[in-house]
């Protein structure tokens, strides 16, 4: 098979993997090396580096041949599809050629399971060794560890890649048994624990020895498929919280299930991917990582799924109206973070600006506050925004209008040239 045909097949087969990011990795310039994406920070496909640039990578599978028969996967053993596999040399050459043509600045490498997990990982490691050692490639590499592979192979992969990830795929053990019987929860979580421990050990050794080998400096991530099973948002979010707490993941990615195969246990191929649900989970994930929320605060047994029409932070605020409205001039940083429309940067600016005078609603816009959401939950100097209603039902209606791009009536005012000043 021609190399171009392999690339076409294996790049297309990799498109369902959402876990592409490079946050947290720093690769400085090294004399005699190639693949430096910036003078200080390397990046990943369609994510942003610290200087605001969008970084691209070559995103491919080592092979789409697979001994597993996961019912949701287009590359499953029983699916009738074109198969291909790169040799390690082919993949390394292809990556270098793409880099030298300025198409990419890094590599995202995953794979189906060819023969067994160990053999597949050996092929991936061989390809990355050629890139790093023979070609001196210093660009960003994100590699997928194969569940069930030997610990020593996971270690070797982590010494070659900037980021590792082990995909959980399905949020529950029941889902795995039903749709991916060849995979087990233990086989997925074991390498996660190893990556966590070895990354921690690597950081400790770097403090003592400047040239100690670096293990997965950009950490690890995972991916969850949303919509292939009946797991609730609450279950998914509690799993996410546990992964962040126990395994110190950098990111959990959510992938709306795209029906690509017909099966009685899966949504029909006519079902639209739950993209809005995926979006709400990402918003909730952001609240866990940067806003101090916990999963149990956002959803409960009575409300196991997010309202698709309102973002999770607004939903939480409406459910806790006893804490609102918040007085902008007195609220502490943690409380400001819980106000819809106010993020970490906005909260810090508010605390700084209010030291010099009383803030008005108009001032908040200049500080980066999203006033179309925040206005419902704050007072400025004891004043409430005119024309707003504060019952839960009215807030839901008004915020749904905001989400749909319609401003509340209180905001829609045409100024007149002949109005008296004041």
Where are these regions (language model features)?
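Short Fe-S-cluster ligation motifs
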Residues: 96-112, 284
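Conserved, mostly hydrophobic/aromatic
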Residues: 57, 70, 109, 166, ...
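Long, highly charged, low-complexity intrinsically disordered interaction regions
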Residues: 265-337, 373-422
């Amino acid at each position: 098979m021609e190399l171009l045909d392999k690339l076409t097949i294996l790049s297309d087969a990799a498109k369902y993997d959402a876990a592409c990011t490079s946050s947290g990795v720093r690769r400085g310039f090294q004399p005699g090396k190639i693949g430096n994406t910036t003078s200080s920070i390397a990046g990943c496909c369609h994510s942003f580096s610290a200087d605001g640039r969008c970084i691209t990578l070559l995103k491919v599978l080592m092979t789409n041949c697979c001994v597993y028969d996961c019912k949701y996967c287009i590359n499953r053993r029983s699916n009738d599809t074109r198969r291909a596999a790169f040799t390690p040399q082919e993949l390394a050459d292809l990556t270098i050629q793409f880099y030298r043509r300025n198409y990419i600045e890094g590599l995202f490498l995953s794979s189906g399971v060819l023969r067994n997990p160990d053999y597949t990982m050996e092929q991936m490691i061989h390809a990355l060794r050629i890139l790093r050692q023979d070609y001196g490639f210093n660009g960003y590499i994100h590699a997928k560890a194969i569940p069930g592979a030997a610990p020593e192979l996971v270690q070797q992969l982590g010494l070659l890649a900037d980021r590792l990830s082990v995909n959980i795929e399905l949020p529950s053990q029941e889902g795995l048994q039903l749709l991916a019987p060849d995979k087990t929860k233990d086989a997925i979580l074991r390498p996660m624990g190893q990556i966590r421990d070895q990354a921690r050990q690597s950081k400790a050794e770097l403090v003592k020895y400047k040239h100690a080998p670096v293990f997965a400096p950009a950490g690890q991530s995972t991916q969850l498929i949303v919509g292939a099973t009946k797991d609730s948002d609450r279950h998914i979010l509690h799993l996410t919280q546990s992964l962040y707490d126990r395994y110190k993941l950098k990111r959990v990615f959510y992938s709306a299930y795209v029906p690509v195969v017909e099966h009685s246990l899966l949504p029909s191929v006519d079902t639209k991917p739950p993209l809005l649900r995926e979006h709400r989970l990402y918003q909730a994930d952001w609240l866990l990582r940067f806003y101090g929320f916990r999963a149990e605060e956002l959803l409960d047994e009575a409300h196991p799924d997010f309202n698709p029409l309102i973002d999770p932070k607004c939903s939480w605020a409406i459910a806790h109206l006893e804490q609102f409205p918040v007085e902008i001039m007195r609220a502490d940083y943690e409380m400001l973070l819980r106000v819809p429309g106010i993020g970490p940067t906005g909260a810090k600016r508010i605390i700084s600006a209010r030291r010099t005078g009383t803030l008005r609603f108009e001032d908040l816009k200049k500080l980066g506050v999203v006033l179309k959401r925040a206005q419902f939950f704050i007072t400025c100097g004891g004043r409430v925004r005119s024309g707003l209603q504060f019952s839960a039902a009215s807030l839901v209606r008004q915020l749904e209008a905001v989400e749909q791009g319609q401003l509340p009536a209180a905001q829609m005012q045409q100024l007149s040239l002949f109005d008296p000043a004041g």
